[in-house]
């Protein structure tokens, strides 16, 4: 609330609380986007996605969610956006739910796996190291070495994730044990995975390729192939889909913004005290 008021109030009308105090000041520069850039929150749990919806904020999931599970998250997110529980944290509603997936695209599936799976697993392991189980000594802990030693114990078994000829998912499974895979495969495999996320209503998929020991040249080749052979299907009609979405959500967004306290006017009598002598 404080930050977004600094974005839109001219001057910022000040704030006083136990944790933060600031007098009336003209905070510049103001954002180029009006009223301010879209607000997002990174989410690892469904509860945080629900919280994002109550604040009218975009939800960016780092939990490598499967399409079927994402369907439930999407339903709850947009139901909440359309409910009286949504009181925007900013002065615009950013109704979007995005998921993060590792990606490496190549016409040969095994090549895509060899180029991308270890980096993808290191990305997932390093997130868990910092947010879940890691014991870190700054400047001394070698996360890559620990990853190589412990990866299978934490759900990053290479043999399971490296299966070929499978329908892609956030994870692949073998005898009930899962391992992170994501969008690592051929253009056809990646396209089919993205279709599944699109069908359940996920707005955006954010790819992670630049992780671990992944080579720059391989990443560039993967992105170029994706742009040529996969992206056009999802880019076509994007403008019309976004327009229809905004029209569908317009009444809910208008109602939500009406529940948000508007920008304040600072008293014209406020004077900044002279600090020098």
Where are these regions (language model features)?
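An alpha-helical appendage that flanks or caps ligand/catalytic pockets
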Residues: 1-30, 68-202, 231, 235-277
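Hydrophobic faces of well-ordered beta-strands that scaffold small-molecule active sites
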Residues: 39-42, 57-62, 95-102, 205-207
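A conserved active-site cap/scaffold subdomain adjacent to cofactor or substrate pockets
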Residues: 44-45, 49-74, 78
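Active-site beta-loop-alpha junctions enriched in small/polar residues
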Residues: 44-46, 64-65, 102-104, 210-212
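Flexible loop/turn segments at secondary-structure boundaries
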Residues: 48-49, 68-69, 106-108, 212-217
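Glycine-rich, proline-tolerant flexible connector loops at the mouths of alpha/beta enzymes
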Residues: 64-67, 135, 207-223
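Amphipathic alpha-helical/coiled-coil segments positioned at domain termini
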Residues: 194, 221, 225-226
